[in-house]
Amino acid sequence: MKKIIFLFSAFLIGFSAQAQDVKEEKKNKNARVSFEVDGICGMCKKRIETAALKTKGVKFAIWDVKTHQINIILDERKTSLKTIKENITNVGHDVNGLKASDKAYESVHPCCKYRDSKIVLDHEGELKKQKNKRK
């Protein structure tokens, strides 16, 4: 009788341990992510951050003009990184792994055409002038 009880208890313990492995991974309500987004100026910054923040579940978004990195805090229970990236490409900015449609890119302000090297160089020249004025 003791052997039967022992075997039955061992079976239950083994079964319950296996059931715990099957549980779904908990989603983080304050996940931090960062990735690269193409853009060149303050207007791009506002557009990129607004697109990210309008995504349900995004709590914080800030994009750096110099590094092109966006830092986001999101609730993974409400949204995904893929959704955020799609929303940013929908306003005309390329994200690593996703390219904005031509229609979306054409909708950005003429000074924000980050795919045009002349405009990018013009912005870089403006940044240098601003730095010299501050000194």
Question: Model-predicted segments: where are they?
Answer:
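Mid-chain, structured segments of secreted extracytoplasmic proteins
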Residues: 60-106
